[in-house]
Swiss-Prot record:
Homotrimer. Binds to both RNA-binding sites in the C-terminal region of Rne and to RhlB. One of its GO terms (molecular function) is endoribonuclease inhibitor activity. It is found in: Cytoplasm. This is Regulator of ribonuclease activity A. Globally modulates RNA abundance by binding to RNase E (Rne) and regulating its endonucleolytic activity. Can modulate Rne action in a substrate-dependent manner by altering the composition of the degradosome. Modulates RNA-binding and helicase activities of the degradosome. Its main location: cytoplasm. GO terms for cellular component: cytoplasm. Keywords: Cytoplasm. GO terms for biological process: regulation of RNA metabolic process. Belongs to the RraA family. Pfam families: RraA-like (PF03737). It comes from the Bacteria.
Length: 161
């Protein structure tokens, strides 16, 4: 489904939170949305790989990576897991790598930056907890919508009609 965050803000400005503009699109889909699943980790992508092996239909994985620009939490092989398991998108408050390969994948990916250095794979972090970045607190099962203009959050699904 295509989402237009500008139009959604025009209609739902009183019920959405708008994430501060700091993210760039790295995936092959320009817009995505769904119910969020959260991970909090720092320079370790083990939990991300584990989560993306689960069924992701209708879901967006939202990762609080502490804003680290030193290690990439997502690479092409982990992103391929998300595609294979039908995730709608991934938002990473941190970095990605394999940028050319990511843009060929049929999934939305937003992150702060790219860097070639990979992350540890020790599965250190927390799952399904509230996380806060970009001036917004994200709760598991909230709904997030993203496109090239921005990212917005709603406690309930938004009607696209």
């Amino acid at each position: 489904m295509e989402y237009n965050t500008s139009e959604l803000c025009d209609t739902y400005i009183d019920v959405v939170d708008v994430v501060e503009p700091m993210f760039s699109n790295y995936g092959g889909c320009n817009s995505f949305g769904g119910s969020i699943s959260t991970i909090k980790c720092f320079e370790d992508n083990g939990l991300i790989a584990e989560a993306l092996q689960q069924d992701g239909e209708g879901k967006v994985l939202l990762v609080d990576g502490g804003g680290s620009l030193r290690r990439a939490l997502l690479d092409a092989s982990i992103a391929q897991l998300a595609v294979d398991n039908k995730w709608e998108g991934i938002i990473i408050y941190g970095s990605v790598r394999d940028v050319d390969a990511l843009e060929d994948l049929d999934i939305g990916i937003q992150a702060l930056a790219s860097i070639p250095v990979g992350a540890d794979e020790n599965s250190v972090g927390e799952l399904e907890i509230p996380v806060n970045f970009g001036g917004v607190t994200f709760l598991p099962l909230d709904h997030v919508y993203a496109d090239n203009t921005g990212i917005i959050l709603s406690p309930e699904p938004l009607d696209m009609e």
